[in-house]
A protein has these predicted regions:
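Short, conserved charged micro-motifs
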Residues: 47-51, 107, 163-167
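M16 family metallopeptidases and their MPP-like homologs
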Residues: 1-14, 36-42, 93-103, 129-219
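Conserved, carboxylate-rich catalytic/transport cores that coordinate ions
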Residues: 28
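An aromatic/glycine/proline-enriched structural segment found at the starts
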Residues: 38-103, 203-204
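Short amphipathic alpha-helical signal-transduction/dimerization elements
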Residues: 58, 119-123, 173-181
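Active/ligand-binding-proximal structured segments within catalytic/core domains
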Residues: 97, 107-119, 126-129
Length: 219
């Protein structure tokens, strides 16, 4: 609610429609500067020639004299759970849960990723077995945000219209509440790690995806 992560990158539609040109120019001059930008070049190319082009086109841009202040807003501890119900016309029901998690650089982040893979894996994960195999849900997934500051782990369960969303939500919440009491086999953990390592290997074979991911981590 307080941290800027909760705000749209370029503002809401209403912001864009109402903002004045002088404010846009001021924002551009302050933030669109060499010390606040990253250039990623990916693919098969001549390194020396690429660097010469970078120097030619970006080198003349002067170093800014202003200094950017680091963000100081810290999301305060959450006082209890928050629930939001969104009603729309459609042919599927969704349950979404988010739990606070540490930032990407935290020592516990990798362990959290492995745990997430273990419990959401198709078809061996405990959530898959309890929700999809029992026909309460048609599918589910989970992921963690990879951020500089603390973020959240997200779970989504898809529930057919002829099934009870309340029952599926109860099973989901109950299972996640019991995760800290569960024990997992070495085989499950190894499989989870291998899946995560394979995703990194696949990423390294896709030039565009790798470049985009690098900018995400740098940012």
């Amino acid at each position: 609610l307080w941290h800027n992560y909760g705000k749209s990158t370029i503002g809401s539609k209403e912001d864009i429609e109402r903002v004045k040109a002088p404010s846009l120019k001021q924002f551009y001059k302050k933030y669109y500067q060499p010390d606040n930008a990253v250039l990623v070049i990916a693919g098969k190319f001549d390194e020396k020639k690429a660097l010469s082009y970078v120097q030619q086109y970006f080198g003349p841009i002067p170093r800014p004299t202003r200094k950017l202040e680091p963000p100081y807003t810290v999301e305060p501890p959450q006082d209890g759970e928050r629930n939001v119900t969104l009603s729309r016309t459609g042919d599927i029901q969704h349950i979404a849960l988010a739990y606070h998690t540490p930032p990407l650089a935290d020592n516990d982040f990798a362990a959290n990723e492995a745990l997430l893979e273990v419990i959401t894996n198709n078809p061996s994960g405990v959530l898959y077995k309890k929700l999809v195999e029992t026909k309460m849900s048609s599918g589910l997934y989970g992921y963690s945000q990879t951020l500089y500051d603390p973020g959240f782990s997200y779970f989504q369960v898809d529930v057919p219209m002829d099934k009870s969303i309340d029952s599926a939500k109860h099973v989901l919440l109950t299972t996640l509440d019991e995760v800290n009491k569960m024990s997992f086999t070495e085989e499950e953990l190894t499989r989870s790690k291998n899946i995560l390592l394979k995703s990194i290997e696949d990423l390294n074979s896709k030039t565009t995806d790798l470049a985009i991911q690098l900018t995400e981590y740098i940012g």
